[in-house]
Amino acid sequence: PSTIWVRTNSSNYDWLWQHMDAMMKEYTYRYGKHHATERLTHYLWEHPKNITHGDFTDPPQCMPEECKGEDTVLAYQTYYIIEKSSFAKWKRREIPEWFNEKNSNLESKNKEYIGFVTA
C-alpha cells in the first residue's frame, strides 16, 4: 500500500522524501553515525519522470484494524502503543508526551474491559 501511495502524485513523493531525510538526521543524532540508506537520498531527490502532480493525500494505515481511525497520526500513535510499546526506546530523546498519555489511557480502558476497575 505505501509504495502505491507514494507513486500516486508528486506531493506524496515530496512528503515521503522529507520524512526520509528527517529520519536520516534523527538516526545520525541518536547514534552518531550515518545510516547506509542515506547514500541514496540524492538519487531520490528528483521526482520519477512519469509521476503526476497532485495534492497530498494521507498515507495508508498499514496496521491492524483495531488501530486504524480517521486521523492517520493518531492511528499510528495507537499502533505504536498497542503493537510496539514492549520494545519502543527513545535513545537520546525523552519519551513523547502522546506515548505516555495515551498509554495510560489505554491501560485504564483495558483494565476496565477485563474487570480490574469497577464503576
Predicted regions and their residues:
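Sequence termini and other peripheral, non-core segments
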Residues: P1-A119
